């Protein structure tokens, strides 16, 4: 007589096989999750070639990239399209990389050559000598004399005006019609009065010849201003300073009082 199959035994075996299969699937899923979701810190030198299992705190982190050098994008022809420098601790995400790749080409800035006019001052062209061999007296009745040694000027009360310095005045062109730039040269020499900083004595500068054009050496130029019988010589290089005198002092540059900045011009030639 044929044996009747035990249906309960078959159901039991089927249930057991499904349980084992389900267990294997769950284990595989867990392994895949830890593989894809976990992020790892860089291995230390002493941990190289050693297995390190990720901790639970390392799961579900956003992938990040740290760069220590410049990121440079170069076209096929070798031209630099984009250069960006990142700090040591700056993180670069995938979105940042995509943004850099999609940025338009930037022009590499090059230093532009500066026009000569940027460096040079206004150009002053020589015209002519407008006064010759005149004497400068201040309102203290002092005349300008040449100090011993010949490098400086001073003011002194003179009995004999032959001891006073005689000057020639050379006129130059200016952009402003209301101003007349001039040079003061000691007559029959190549020594020109040169302005210095405030309260510093003026110098006598020797030039090979009368400058035909003055650009940079504006210390040699003064704006000649006349107010009645008073004459003022304002420095072109230092527009707030005038040629000035004081008792027992060298001729110097000053803004005004206590220094004397106005002069009388005494003509010695008719």
From Swiss-Prot:
The modification N6-acetyllysine is found at residue 82. It comes from the Eukaryota. Its main location: nucleus. One of its GO terms (cellular component) is extracellular space. Acetylated within its nuclear localization sequence, which impacts subcellular localization. SMART domains: IL1. It is found in: Nucleus; Cytoplasm; Secreted. Keywords: Acetylation, Cytokine, Cytoplasm, Glycoprotein, Inflammatory response, Mitogen, Nucleus, Phosphoprotein, Pyrogen, Secreted. Transmembrane segments: none annotated. InterPro entries: IL-1_alpha, IL-1_CS, IL-1_fam, IL-1_propep, IL1/FGF. Residues 82-86 are annotated as: Nuclear localization signal (NLS). The keyword Acetylation applies. One of its GO terms (biological process) is inflammatory response. Glycans are attached at residue 139. One of its GO terms (molecular function) is interleukin-1 receptor binding. The modification Phosphoserine is found at residue 87. Residues 1-112 form a propeptide. The similarity among the IL-1 precursors suggests that the amino ends of these proteins serve some as yet undefined function. Cytokine constitutively present intracellularly in nearly all resting non-hematopoietic cells that plays an important role in inflammation and bridges the innate and adaptive immune systems. After binding to its receptor IL1R1 together with its accessory protein IL1RAP, forms the high affinity interleukin-1 receptor complex. Signaling involves the recruitment of adapter molecules such as MYD88, IRAK1 or IRAK4. In turn, mediates the activation of NF-kappa-B and the three MAPK pathways p38, p42/p44 and JNK pathways. Belongs to the IL-1 family. Monomer. Interacts with TMED10; the interaction mediates the translocation from the cytoplasm into the ERGIC (endoplasmic reticulum-Golgi intermediate compartment) and thereby secretion. Interacts with IL1R1. Interacts with S100A13; this interaction is the first step in the export of IL1A, followed by direct translocation of this complex across the plasma membrane. This is Interleukin-1 alpha.
